[in-house]
């Protein structure tokens, strides 16, 4: 009885999390655009007397879902490549229809390749989902290899149409995406500032770093080969200042928040709200008796208000920096230690196994099994995958009933077009609140499209078959996540912590000897460590990764304070060789503690008079290591 109660205590929070409603605003524009991109090709096909052609083109309409917050130039290139990829997937599905082994192998390859590319480049969205759907749907059509090019062409046209809808905002606001991402960035900076002195500061700090990275990817290009416009100049400066303000907030976080902190937070939010317009803002008056961290934060805020007003004369010599090429990220991710490569391999293997299982056992419309596995496998950990499986199973029941009700009346082409548009619109409206709310419309939409292509089966048979397929596919996806590289992130944690501690030791030594350290390398390592820790918490079986949090938290805090210290460098006092050796010994002991999984030996924690906050964080790291590994 006690064991059953314990199991219930573990399972119930997972189920509750799976159905938790998020208070996100409804994305009206994206929902309407998505519905139009999917439904209009079917309407055109129906009016032309070829509903089947319109249905094939509507698969390309899913390209619209890959539009993110990037600039219009980057969005055009991305959606063009996605259109080509989905069209190729549809064509390959037609060519390989009926070739059991080849179909499964190519499906796994498509899924793995798409997952690898999207993850390595950090592209948000459905990732490989619609590449997989295009291949599977086309493989279920009547086998006719001679139609491969024609069907791929229709899919590509649907994708180009969807791309046009996604780019239409360029006509009246060419810099809309850049302004939107900077608004979010300054709102996140305000949230980070408001979290100072609270238990949520560490998480707010991490979320701000991720938001700054997204802003850089949106605003910056691969170079600066042409003259910048006034808009570009303003965005580059605001991006630079966002980074400076984040470092200033870290510097300021050593102080106790007061009423004035709330005023600064309000100013940051207002700045974000008004970034779309060059409007004059009132700046803060800085008192002579302000503390250095507070004065620095005021100065950075005033500069942002000045730039946001459009009042700057001297042009930047170039962009704040250049983004590395896409090949740089792909090359770095192609490594056995890379979570990106492992996730892609896991995805491809499970798709191959699911398709082989479905084909070997002769399931009607066998593609629903690997398609369900593909949807479930989008979860990054076992817990998230279990969430997806629960959400998909519950939502599919409603979705199948809804699709059955629509198809029961055998609607004509025009009505099918309106149904697809409405279902897709509702799907995009609700998915931001909870995936479970969107699954009924996702399932119904996919069923209406695919069953309208095939037809033939009775409503009762079709409903039972789809429910069975989704259940089997979800189980295969969940098993794949639980069995393949199931503790990959947990095993990486010691190496990642050791790397962060080593970089912090090198960084601090350069800081104290008047040299310039590599900020980018340390910041990337801090983000990777936190990402691996979050994933380790969701792995199965649970490895008590949360017990390591005191040490990981100490390393994270120290890293960000070191970044702040370099940005607000003070005149360095002479640091003797003996003190440098003591510092090295401390960091070596900290590294060994994590690698050997034991408490660090009794050692004197270095004291740095010019940086009292760093001295405090060194003590916190030492205490965190002792807490994490105490017996």
UniProtKB/Swiss-Prot annotation:
Say where the protein is mainly found: membrane
Compartments it resides in: Cell membrane
> Which InterPro entries has this protein been placed in?
Memb_transporter_dom (IPR049453)
Which is one Pfam family of this protein?
FUSC_2
Membrane topology label? Multi-pass membrane protein
Give the coiled coil ranges.
none
Q: Which keywords belong to this entry?
A: Cell membrane, Membrane, Transmembrane, Transmembrane helix
One GO CC annotation, please? plasma membrane
Q: Which residues cross the membrane?
A: 42-62, 76-96, 106-128, 152-172, 344-364, 366-386, 398-418, 429-449, 464-484
Quick check: keyword Transmembrane helix in the entry? yes
Highest taxon, organism lineage:
Bacteria
Task: Name the family.
Answer: Belongs to the YccS/YhfK family.
Protein name in the entry: Uncharacterized membrane protein YvaC
Originating organism: Bacillus subtilis (strain 168)
> Mind giving the lineage of the organism this protein is from?
Bacteria, Bacillati, Bacillota, Bacilli, Bacillales
């Amino acid at each position: 009885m006690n064991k059953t109660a314990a199991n219930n205590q573990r399972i119930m929070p997972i189920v509750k999390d799976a159905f938790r409603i998020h208070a996100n605003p409804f994305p009206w524009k994206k929902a309407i655009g998505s519905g139009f991109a999917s439904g209009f090709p079917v309407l055109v096909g129906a009016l032309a007397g070829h509903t089947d052609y319109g249905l094939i083109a509507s698969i390309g309409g899913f390209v619209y879902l890959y539009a993110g917050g990037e600039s219009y130039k980057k969005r055009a290139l991305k959606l063009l490549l996605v259109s080509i990829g989905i069209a190729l997937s549809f064509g390959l599905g037609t060519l390989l229809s009926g070739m059991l082994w080849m179909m499964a192998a190519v499906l796994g390859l498509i899924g793995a390749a798409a997952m690898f590319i999207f993850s390595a480049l950090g592209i948000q969205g459905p990732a490989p989902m619609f590449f997989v759907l295009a291949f599977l749907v086309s493989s279920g059509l009547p086998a006719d290899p001679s139609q491969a090019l024609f069907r791929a062409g229709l899919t590509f046209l649907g994708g180009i149409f969807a791309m046009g809808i996604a780019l239409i905002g360029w006509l009246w606001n060419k810099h809309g995406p850049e302004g939107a991402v900077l608004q979010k960035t300054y709102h996140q900076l305000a949230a980070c500032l408001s979290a100072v002195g609270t238990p949520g500061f560490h998480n707010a700090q991490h979320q701000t770093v991720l938001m700054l990275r997204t802003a850089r990817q949106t605003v910056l290009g691969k170079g600066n080969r042409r003259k910048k416009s006034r808009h570009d100049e303003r965005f580059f400066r605001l991006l630079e200042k966002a980074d400076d303000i984040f470092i200033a907030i870290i510097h300021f976080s050593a102080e106790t928040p007061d009423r004035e902190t709330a005023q600064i937070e309000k100013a940051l939010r207002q700045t974000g709200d008004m970034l779309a317009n060059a409007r004059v803002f009132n700046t803060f008056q800085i008192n002579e008796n302000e503390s250095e961290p507070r004065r620095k934060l005021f100065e950075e805020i005033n500069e942002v208000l000045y730039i946001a007003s459009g009042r700057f004369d001297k042009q930047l010599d170039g962009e704040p920096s250049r983004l590395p090429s896409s090949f740089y990220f792909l090359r770095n991710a192609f490594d056995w230690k890379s979570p990106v490569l492992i996730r892609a391999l896991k995805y491809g293997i499970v798709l191959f196994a699911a398709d082989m299982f479905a084909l070997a056992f002769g399931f009607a419309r066998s593609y629903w099994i690997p398609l369900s596995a593909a949807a479930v496998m989008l979860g990054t950990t076992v817990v998230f995958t279990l969430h997806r499986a629960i959400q998909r199973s519950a939502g599919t029941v409603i979705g199948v009933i809804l699709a059955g009700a629509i198809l029961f009346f055998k609607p004509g082409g025009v009505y099918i077009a309106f149904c697809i548009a409405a279902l897709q619109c509702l799907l995009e409206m609700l998915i931001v609140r909870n995936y479970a709310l969107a699954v009924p419309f996702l399932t119904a939409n996919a069923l209406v499209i695919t069953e309208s292509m095939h037809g033939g089966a009775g409503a009762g048979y079709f409903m039972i078959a789809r429910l069975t397929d989704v259940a089997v596919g979800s189980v295969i996806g969940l098993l794949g996540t639980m069995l393949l590289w199931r503790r990959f992130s947990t095993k990486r944690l010691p190496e990642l912590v050791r790397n962060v501690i080593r970089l912090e030791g090198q960084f601090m030594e350069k800081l104290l000897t008047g040299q310039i350290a590599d900020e980018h390398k340390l910041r990337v390592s801090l983000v990777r460590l936190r990402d691996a820790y979050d994933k380790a918490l969701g792995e199965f079986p649970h490895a008590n990764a949360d017990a390591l949090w005191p040490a990981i938290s100490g390393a994270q805090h120290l890293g960000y304070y070191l970044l702040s210290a370099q940005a607000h460098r003070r005149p360095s006092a002479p640091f003797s060789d003996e003190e440098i050796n003591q510092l090295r010994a401390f960091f070596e002991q900290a590294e060994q503690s994590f690698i050997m999984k034991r408490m660090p030996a009794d050692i004197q924690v270095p004291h740095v008079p010019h940086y009292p906050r760093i001295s405090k964080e060194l003590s916190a790291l030492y205490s965190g290591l002792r807490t994490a590994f105490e017996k």
